[in-house]
UniProtKB/Swiss-Prot annotation:
Its cofactor is (R)-lipoate. The keyword Repressor does not apply. This is Glycine cleavage system H protein. Residues 25-107 form the Lipoyl-binding domain. GO terms for cellular component: cytosol; glycine cleavage complex. InterPro entries: 2-oxoA_DH_lipoyl-BS (IPR003016), Biotin_lipoyl (IPR000089), GCV_H (IPR002930), GCV_H/Fam206 (IPR033753), GCV_H_sub (IPR017453), Single_hybrid_motif (IPR011053). The modification N6-lipoyllysine is found at residue 66. GO terms for biological process: glycine decarboxylation via glycine cleavage system.
Amino acid sequence: MSNNIPAELKYVASHEWLRLEEDGTITVGITHHAQELLGDIVFVELPEVGANLAAEEQAGVVESVKAASDVYAPIAGEVVAVNDDLPSAPETANSDPYGAGWFFKIKPANPADYDGLLTAEQYAGEVD
């Protein structure tokens, strides 16, 4: 797998990635492909901690010099944390999309839903 699509993560077709944490929460961000399409990110709106989101529900917004795009909840659950550094440094979603550029953490309503998401290989097929 390319470094731009880490093998240990899960993905959805709307270009969000998910990482299952040891405590059972799931960290969510936008993929390298998404940030590349958007260009220089200048604004990020995150969901509220405590929000209960349905899968595929709008969870936030990301705006770049080229476009604005919604960020979706890739899995149903409760938002338990947001990346408070991101709104003041939105370019982090460009420079480190799988690390410091994460968007929010969600406690899944049904943890088994995670297993049905796209693997890195499947996501690579979606973006080729």
